Amino acid sequence: MASAVVSMVSTTASRFALLKVDSSSDSDSEKARGTHTSGKAHSGSAARGKTNVNEKKKEKRRKKKEQQQSEANELRNLAFKKIPPKASLGVSAAVQEHITHTVPKDAQKEDWQQWQQRDKQLTSDMFEADLEKALILSKLEYEESKVNGDGVNGVPQSKKVNKKDKRKNNQGKDKPLTVPLKDFQLEDQQAKKQEELKSPALPQGSGFFNKVEDDVTKIILNEKRKEHSTDVTESFATPEYSTEPALKDGKTEVLKQEIEKKEIALQQMRSKISQWEAKYREVKARNSQLLKMLQEGEMKDKAEILLQVDELLSIKNELTLQVTTLHAALEQERSKVKVLQAEQVRYQGGKKSKRNPELEHGR
């Protein structure tokens, strides 16, 4: 049936057969040619036609995929300013010309060189900074190990730490861990100092490491002084040291006399202070009385002024009433005058009308 239908249909040449076609439309032209040849050749089975159509569809899909991939690669190269490939399988000539016109090769090379230089600078700077940090940390650890190595009574610091860890482990089985206040404060101080040393920017130069060593020695000396001061205060807090010194040879009597004199002077000063306080209270009372008197006088003046204002307001109201009454009377008189004038005009008009017929009869 299919072959009969194909043989019955008349095929004609297309108007667009002479035009050039891109790679994307090759499959369509091949399909058109296939239909043209199939129309000419009346012999052929339906199975061969179906297989040809399927193969053409597969080729078309494959070409479309290749074209999409090539376009995506070109867009990536344009976005990252890379040199595009010289030849691509499914790319059209127009797209390649557009790419070559938009992105010149010299600009691409210059951009690539700039990126390489920046990358090298960044990596070198990071490497130098990491090296300086590592050197500083190693020196600090070495100085701390030196200072802590000179332990008290010939016991090194590592053994002390091990003993403390053992005690803590033994205590943790029976009781909760208790950290002394000194150790806690020292740990906090050391942590803060390490953070301060790490945080600032690392200067460059040969004298930098000498400065770091000086800072470390200063910090260690300050810590030793603090420990010494705490030990001294604890030793003085013991009952062995009495606050009252044992003075002899009449020094106690002299001190007692001086104390008595100072007590007498204090009593005199207290009496003077009490007198001044009494005087201050009297002055305060007088000032309060004066304030009351002034306030009363001001209130009286204000009351008189208010009374005068009330009287003036009442007079004003009376005058306004009189003015309103007079104005009403004036309006009434004006209306009366207008009425009289109108009557007068009417009367005069009547007289003139009477005179006119008399004159006519006389003539």
UniProtKB/Swiss-Prot annotation:
Q: Which GO terms describe its cellular component?
A: Golgi apparatus
Primary localization class, coarse: Golgi
Annotated function:
May play a role in the regulation of insulin-dependent IRS1 tyrosine phosphorylation in adipocytes.
Q: Which keywords fit this entry according to its UniProt record?
A: Coiled coil, Golgi apparatus
Q: Point to the regions of Basic residues compositional bias.
A: 160-170
Q: Which family does it belong to?
A: Belongs to the GKAP1 family.
Record the organism: Xenopus laevis
* GO biological process terms, semicolon-separated: signal transduction
Q: Show the segment(s) annotated as Disordered.
A: 17-79, 147-182
Q: Where in the cell is it found?
A: Golgi apparatus
Gene that specifies this protein: gkap1-b
Q: Which InterPro entries match?
A: GKAP1
* Taxonomy, superkingdom: Eukaryota
Q: What is this protein called?
A: G kinase-anchoring protein 1-B
| Coiled-coil intervals | 50-79, 249-298, 328-348
